[in-house]
From Swiss-Prot:
It comes from Azotobacter vinelandii (strain DJ / ATCC BAA-1303). It is a peripheral membrane protein. Its cofactor is Zn(2+). Zn(2+) binds at C345, D347, H516, C531. It comes from the Bacteria. This is Probable inorganic carbon transporter subunit DabA. The lineage of its organism: Bacteria, Pseudomonadati, Pseudomonadota, Gammaproteobacteria, Pseudomonadales.
């Protein structure tokens, strides 16, 4: 995201590498909040650009600065790129093209350098350099003395349900709660009196504590950056909760300033204990003028070489895809008879599902659109204490949809009883049910099955429940939100949805709207598997809501007045696709007419067969699944692994995502894209000025771009920007995961989610005229930034000439694909049975 007003850009900081000695607490706190991770608690996990703080810079400049400042590894290793080149995954023609574009007349010299040259290693990162002098000069490791206690206190204070006893917060905030405990407890958090006394002084300030620890005001900013980036997970979580307190169901008040004050007190106490209060401030151990930690990082030949290799890797994938899209024949005439139409999420995991449906029923049509289906609201399940957002995180809804008449009840599980945590109850249960749990555990190894331990997207909403979709009075409100939508509001959203995908005529008798979610067991990152366009929730409620709107007679009358005539016999049916188990559930089937019910039974059989084929295609990535069995048998194995307690990879989620196509289906319908592409339906003919396109790109850039970049950065640096392996993870307070009991929270994605991913930035391909697309992205600064700063690549396909234009340096320039031949997929099923790695783009016969 662009820096907020008042932020200093990297270029501005580079002109003043040495900061003024004056310490501005508010400015430093603002900068810390800007650069710390922005991952929300687990229940609200949504993919985002991990380097959001640098998004106002060009991608390669941002990578250079972020790695030089914070020590992130933001590309593959040089040897890895060279290995990919020698294996043919980076093609020589593409590498030559990229080197010429970067180095011009020096391209021959630089081709030799990148392929076989050596480069000076990068300097050590700036972060941690000042604070490291405690260990270097005074032989004391403050992190090992302070972090275990600090993390336990933070986890206890922010706990959302693991602990039996709640932290006595008093509702006044973190530091107030700590002070209350100090005043009224028999023991203390501190070992010496000085830190305790400082805490109990109500005017305890960051500057005052830093005077004791560091003394030199010119070092204060560097010290705080070093301190907070020694545990960016916890610090980032605190900034998220401070900015969005509603993200916690059990509300807690905490801010970064409070965290820093308490940590500084713990550091003073550790030094007092270690040196018996006879120690000098850090200033005495340092020499020389401090360098501004956020100053521009000098560019080196190694940076240039890595940028060249990265673009060569990306264009080795882009070029054959663009060539294949350009070669697609003109759109076929409309089908005279349509069996059904289906609206699906643009999600890359749905790409293959749509392909299988279309191959089984050539008379159907499928469309892709962001999986909230254009209806933005909060959803409140029956008997729930709070509501949840089910639309893109950047949207602030004004509407609430409530569930009523739910028949679902959570299955009782005696092991979840609170009595198991009591002294007496715990002993009794362990001696009785404990033996039975061992038997169940052993049985689950041999025969995995669904249990209350698992998370299932089908539980998000009861199929038999009712939803308060129609608002009958503007005064019908709850928590400041309007309950339901008026008829006019419903018609507006219905028009926008249908117009954005180009479905404004020739409706089939049944139109399915299929959201998606996931199911998994023993997986803290469950929200990452659901729909990103629904803020990490399943799209089931959204599917039912938009179907209600499109079936409403008054809405249809308004649409007809705007040229969208939906036949009276056409019915919209909501559904949910579980992408882990490849299962589907349909909603409100009892509202179908007799004729539609017969059609629906036939269509449901097509969906079921497509799900089995989809499971078989997915299984080629699963080492322990025999992909050579029949689709039905493979499907059963895939469903079993989804509920296994011991399966760290229930599905590979968005791994290998690299592409988003915004255009008519004929551009991709005859292509095998290996589940790597988001597919957003769009017809330029109904949107000559780009009004609908603006809405599409405004959603696709942060949603698809956030997914792509989180996978990218979690892959290239899984230890700092990812979460490492799932195996040692412990869930901390139900808000995050950490290694062990005393570790920092691990933002980003675990290695099991990204190990098969190829780190390439997403290419968005739009079917429209270049001038229209350029004017469209210029209208929205946040959208423009994604493309102008090259966090996403953008190519336009001229719908009349099929010429390609790539976006670079603020303009579209012609692009001529290097790939001259497209392979044909003779037998896809054979490929699924024998190949586990990425497959090239193929033409479908």
């Amino acid at each position: 995201m662009p820096m907020a007003s008042g932020d200093e850009s990297m270029s501005a900081r580079s002109e003043n590498p040495v900061q003024s000695a004056r310490f501005d607490e508010a400015t430093v706190l603002h900068e810390l909040e800007h650069y710390l991770p922005k991952q929300a608690p687990l229940k609200d996990f949504v993919h985002h650009n991990t380097l959001h703080a640098f998004q106002d810079s060009k991608f390669h400049d941002a990578a250079r600065n972020a790695s030089g400042i914070f020590g992130y590894n933001l590309s593959l290793k040089l040897d890895k790129y060279r290995d990919l080149y020698h294996r043919g995954e980076i093609t020589p023609a593409v590498l030559d093209w990229v080197v010429r574009r970067h180095k011009g007349d020096q391209s021959d010299l630089w081709k030799t350098k990148v392929v076989a040259g050596s480069f000076a290693p990068p300097p050590l990162p700036r972060i941690g350099a000042v604070r490291a002098n405690w260990k270097k000069n005074l032989r004391i490791d403050l992190d090992s003395l302070v972090h275990p206690l600090l993390f336990r206190i933070l986890c206890s204070y922010l706990d959302q349900g693991i602990s039996m006893w709640t932290f006595p917060s008093g509702g006044e905030g973190f530091l107030c709660a700590i002070r209350e405990l100090e005043r009224h407890s028999f023991t203390s958090f501190f070992r010496r009196e000085r830190a305790r006394r400082l805490l109990l002084e109500q005017d305890c300030s960051i500057a005052g504590l830093l005077k004791l620890l560091v003394r030199d005001e010119a070092l204060f900013e560097r010290y705080l950056f070093d301190q907070q980036f020694a545990h960016p997970g916890w610090s980032g979580m605190v900034t998220v909760i401070e900015a969005q307190p509603d993200t916690l169901i059990d509300s807690r008040r905490i801010g970064l300033r409070e965290l820093i004050v308490f940590e500084l007190l713990l550091e003073i106490d550790a030094l007092d204990e270690h040196f018996d209060e006879q120690w000098s401030p850090l200033e005495a151990e340092l020499g020389g003028e401090p360098l501004d930690i956020l100053a521009e990082v000098p560019r080196t030949e190694l940076h240039d070489a890595l940028a060249i290799w990265q673009e060569a890797l990306e264009w080795s994938f882009y070029d054959p895809v663009l060539s294949a899209i350009q070669r697609q024949p003109a759109e076929s005439p409309a089908l005279p008879v349509k069996s059904f139409q289906g609206l699906f999420c643009i999600d890359d995991r749905i790409c293959s599902f749509r392909r299988h449906i279309e191959s089984l029923d050539p008379h159907c049509e499928t469309y892709g659109t962001p999986g909230f289906f254009g209806v933005e609201f909060y959803f409140k399940p029956e008997n729930a204490k709070s509501h949840t957002k089910v639309c893109p995180g950047s949207i602030e809804p004004r509407y609430l949809i409530k569930e009523t008449g739910s028949r679902d009840r959570l299955e009782a599980e005696p092991h979840f009883s609170k009595h198991s945590h009591d002294l007496l109850g715990g002993w009794v249960i362990s001696q009785t049910l404990g033996f039975w749990s061992a038997v169940k555990l052993f049985d689950s190894i041999l025969k995995p099955s669904a249990s209350p331990l698992g998370a299932s997207s089908f539980r998000h909403m009861d199929r038999a429940s009712s939803l308060t979709i129609l608002n009958r009075s503007p005064d019908d409100r709850e928590d400041g939100l309007q309950i339901g939508f008026s008829v006019a509001e419903m018609a507006e959203r219905a028009e926008n949805l249908l117009g954005s995908i180009g479905l404004t005529q020739d409706f089939a008798p049944i139109v399915y709207v299929v959201g998606h979610g996931a199911s998994n067991t023993n997986n803290p990152h469950y929200a990452a598997y659901d729909c990103g366009a629904c803020s990490g929730r399943p799209g089931s409620v959204n599917a039912r809501v938009i179907c209600f709107m499109l079936n409403h007679p008054e809405v249809r009358a308004i649409l007809a007045g705007k040229g969208i005539e939906i036949p009276a016999a056409t019915q919209f049916v909501g559904a949910l696709h579980d992408t882990t188990r490849d299962e589907i559930a349909f909603y409100d089937e009892d509202s179908l007419s007799p004729d539609s019910r017969a059609r629906h039974r036939a269509n449901a059989a097509v969906f079921d067969k497509a799900l089995a084929l989809n499971a078989k295609e997915r299984s080629r990535r699963f080492e322990l699944t025999d992909s050579q069995q029949s689709p039905e048998r493979v499907h059963e194995a895939v469903k079993a692994r989804a509920v296994s307690l011991f399966e760290p990879r229930p599905e590979l989620n968005h791994a290998t995502n690299a592409l988003c196509i915004v255009g008519r289906r004929f551009l991709s319908r005859k292509l095998f894209l290996d589940r790597r592409s988001f597919l957003n339906s769009y017809d330029y003919r109904v949107d000559p000025d780009g009004r609908f396109l603006l809405g599409i790109l405004r959603a696709a850039a942060p949603v698809c771009g956030g997914i792509n970049l989180e996978y990218f950065f979690s892959h290239v640096d899984n230890q700092k920007l990812g979460a490492g392996s799932k195996l040692p993870h412990n869930v901390m307070g139900l808000i995050g995961v950490a290694n062990g009991n005393d570790g920092d929270l691990r933002p980003g994605l675990p290695s099991q989610m990204i190990e098969v991913h190829h780190p390439v930035r997403m290419m968005i391909v739009v079917e429209h005229f270049p001038a229209v697309v350029l004017n469209t992205i210029r209208q929205q600064p946040a959208t423009w930034e994604w493309f102008a700063n090259e966090w996403l690549n953008l190519t336009v396909v001229d719908p009349e000439t099929h010429e390609l234009f790539r976006f670079r340096d603020g303009i579209f320039e012609p692009y001529r694909a290097l790939t001259e031949r497209l392979e044909v997929a003779a037998d896809l099923e054979k490929l699924f049975e024998t190949q586990a790695d990425n497959l090239p783009v193929l033409a479908l016969s």
